[in-house]
Amino acid sequence: MITSVPALQSASSGAVLSTARQSGPKDSSPSAQSNVAPQEAPAAPLIEAWVVSEPYAGLQAQGLGLAEAAAFRPIMQPLQPRFPWRYLAARFWPQPLAALPEETMAAALPPVVVGCGGAGAVVVAALRKRGSAAVQVQHPRIDIRRFDVVLAARHDGLSGPNVVVTRTALHRVTPARLADAAARWAGKLSHLQRPLVAVLVGGDSGRYRFGRREAAKLAHELAAMMEADRVGLALTPSRRTGSEEQALLRQVLEPRGGWIWDGTGENPYFGLLALADVIVVTIDSVSMVSEAVATSAPVMLARLPGHSARQHVFMQALINEGRVREFKGRLDHWPVEPIDDTAEAAAETRRRLGL
């Protein structure tokens, strides 16, 4: 369920897609079940949309998830700010469009641009002045009136006539993607005991710490669960998981039959989401937690040292709703329903853009 406010009545350049078009450039496994959440994608012709973001996987996944769910044809445009501007907050960039490659700016602008994060917001707001309809994912940290639609998670605490509020971060977890991943990974993970626990591990962030001590604690808690509850375990690290921490997890868990992705070959992430009976995820990543709760598996949160007020609000809301519980070193299983607002948010975005 999303929280929405009345549709846009008017704005400056690019308020609705028709305006943007007119003002833009003219040369423009049998034993396993997949954790699939009900979701409907809009049936409409694909409209080109740039997804503008810093090159961070979590940010890019949110923008791509929205664009795909909205039946746009997404083209990823990673930002490349030059020295010295990359060391300055994006809202202070004198020429935001200079963060895009020259060949990008030489091309015809698309009907829609989707910004992700603070830097993406600044660039997309500038592109809106040139005629593209501007959609922003996450709190933009600048005036929301510079966008046609802003999609913000409820823990952002953002409101306004062009704001659509979602319970979780947007993502690319869809029934089709999970079903495909389940079919491809069921055989590869069939040797693991059931119930299967998927573990999604993050890493150090600006607000949470995941070093050797935290990795050792998590590894031994997971090992204790494997022994006490006789579960299979499949773990995937993230790009932020340090090599020493990965080695420690592997040293403790692999001798006990745990499977840990070594970073080679196909990424198992969606396969683990699809096939898991229970998911354990570290609390440092709102995106990973959002993707986990979009499945039909119970989700347990592995606490880490540190604090973020916004992320605390996010996690606590999911705890209060019974969708997640804290991981305490034992298997826990309870009935849950998927939480996924991406498709509804995408439909609302299309409506507000007049599509």
Residue positions per predicted region:
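Active-site and donor-binding regions of nucleotide-sugar-utilizing enzymes
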Residues: 51-165, 171
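Short, structured helix-loop element that forms part of the nucleotide-activated donor/catalytic region
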Residues: 239-253
